[in-house]
Structure formats: structure tokens, C-alpha cells
Amino acid sequence: MSGRKPHHPHHLYRASRTPLPRSLPRSLTAAAVAATVLVLTATGCSPGSSSPSPSGSHRDSAERTGDSVAEATAASPFWVDPASDAARQVEQWEKEGRKDDAKALRRISERAVAEWPAWDNPAPDISRAVRGAAAGKRTVVFVAYNIPHRDCGRYSAGGASDAQAYRDWINDFAGAIGKAPAIVILEPDAVPHLADGCTPAEHHHERYELLSQAITRLKQQPGTRVYLDAGNPDWISDPAKLAEPLRRAGVNTADGFSLNVSNFQTNNAAKAYGTQLSGLLGDAHFTIDTSRNGQGPLPGDRDEAWCNPPGRALGTPPTTKTGNELVDAFLWIKRPGESDGPCRGGPAAGRWWPDYALGLARKTKG
């Protein structure tokens, strides 16, 4: 199936770093998150803009690249990692006198991006993020990406060695979150790969079972919201073909589904597609990855458009103020500046690529 879907590899090499309490109303607001976080202290688009232009012309007060991390995230409930690759790159360029480049890259370093915990032991990465978020009363976004037979053997192939290893991993993942407020994006690609036939039929039953069990386990954490991945509008073009696979995987017991992870589809395209899919799933809510969709997808051959496409831009900054009652959040799930794979001169999937990160930042208006 290598020629059919706009593939999007994820973290191959990051050991990682990457919540909204399920007691919140389904439409997430920053105020609601903040209130919930206060209770739990024991432990990108301008906010309010419902339809940013495909050109990435969104802006808010945090778009000023000279702002500090604290200022840049004041209107967002999400945690910004002060030790991210982007933050370290900014520091290095400042020392080297590359002031303009450092200023541009703050468009990434001062935004909240998802954490992809390690595949061998997720607990240290999660614990570090939860501690950091608690200090600032913030929510962390995590990605659980370790399903057996992941990615059909392509750039991000791998995953847990077997079903029990995955159950153990998810149990450790959930336990490390504890009572902290968290969003978990569950297994990018896993359900679409069932729907498009890329995952061999002999693995289907096990995958449906594991995804459903993962949702159940994660939802035992009182502050965790779970969104089961549903691909992007340019993959399974007919949302009706995804509805039953998502139901079999347990989406009705999750908080909704996620769209556009690591892809470049515009907000409008994702919202239109998500609204159709939501209608087939009892008005399920969803999130949209806006990390790199400021210019939309690369025109031309879609089979070539998924991997480090040139001329792209950062999208709507992470926010819960989406202007759409079905869209719970715009999130940066793909970490901008990390390679999609060894194409167009890029390093291996998941490796930090400063030049590409700078290109995304410079193309972003505002």
C-alpha cells in the first residue's frame, strides 16, 4: 500500500519527552482546563479563530517571536517543554550570533508540542512531562504509538513485540500519568491501516482488541482524555469506511478521534471531514493536528507530498478555542522540525532537522 496513502512516519529515534481531564465538558475550554488543574495540583491559529486561511495567516499575541515561553503560552492550557530540540536549537543559534534564525525558530520552541514516550519504557518520559506541567498548571499532550505491527513495515515500523507486551506498555503509560490532566492521541495510523487493508488480515482482531483495551485502561486515569486516531481527509476519502472500524476499536468509549496527525491538510478540510465522520459516530468530538498545515499540502503528486515537503508552514497554534463545538482542540501532534524520513535530504524519521524547522518557521506569517 505504499502508493495509496499520504504516509506520515513518526518518532523512530526520539526517546521522547509528550492531558484534559475527562470530567470536563466535551467542548474543552482553557478556563475549564485551568479549573480542573487547580483541583489536581496534587500531582496553532489564533485562539477563537474558527477557520484560519490555508496560507497560515493566523496570528495571536503569542505569534510575536520575541515573546517568552510564559507569555507565548498564557492563552493556552498546554505545557511547553523548555528542553525541546527547538528550544536547544534557539539557544545554540543565539550563542552563534544567528539572532534572526533564533527569533524565527521561537515560533516552534514557544509552542506546546506532543510528547511521544519511549517504546521500551514510557514512564520516565511521561513522569518528566507531568512534573513540568504541574509546575505551571498545564496540560500535556501525549501520543501512544507502539501498537504491534506498526506502520506496515515502513519508515516507522516496529511496535510492541506482541499483544501482552503492548498491554504492559499501555498499563505503564497510564500509570505514569496518574491523576494529572492529559490528552492521549492513541495510535496514529492504526485504524486507517485496518480500513485500507495495509495491515494483514491475521492481525485485525488483535489490533481491534488492543485498541479497545488501551482506551479502557487509559480512561481509568481520572484526568485523561483519549482520542483514537482516524487518519486524514486525503487518506480514507469516504469517512463511512472508517466509522465501523473506529467503533470496533472502541471510539465510543473514548473522548473522540484525532485527525491530520503528521499531515498537512488544512483546518477547513479536516473540519469538514471530521464533521462527516462525527455524524456517523453519534456526534463524536475530535482534535486536529495543525502543526504543519499553515500552507496546506504540497500541490501535485500526493504520493510525494507526505515526506518533508518544501514550502510548508506552521499552522494554528495549540488551543482549545477552536470556534467549533465538535473540535475539542487544535494540537501540534507532529513535532515541527522532526523529519518524516530520509527523503529530500532529510535525516531518518523522527530526527531533529534544524533547516527544515527553520523553513517552517520562516514560511509562517505573523
Task: Locate the predicted segments by residue.
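Secretory targeting and sorting signals
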Residues: M1-S50
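N-terminal low-complexity, Pro/Thr-rich disordered segments
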Residues: L28-V33, V39-K99, Y155, R362-G366
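N-terminal carbohydrate-binding/catalytic regions of secreted carbohydrate-active enzymes
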Residues: T73-A176, A180, R335-A361
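Surface-exposed substrate-engagement region within the catalytic domains
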Residues: D81-I108, P233-P354
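Second-shell loop/turn segments in exported
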Residues: E115-D120, A129, R154-A163, D196-H205, ...
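Extracytoplasmic/secreted envelope proteins and their assembly/folding machinery
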Residues: A123-V130, A134, R167-A174, Y208-I215, ...
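Structural preference for beta-strand elements that scaffold enzyme active sites
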Residues: K137-V141, P181-I185, G223-Y227, A254-S258, ...
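Active-site cleft segment of glycoside hydrolase catalytic domains centered on the general acid/base Glu
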Residues: G159-K179, P188-T224, G231, I236-D238
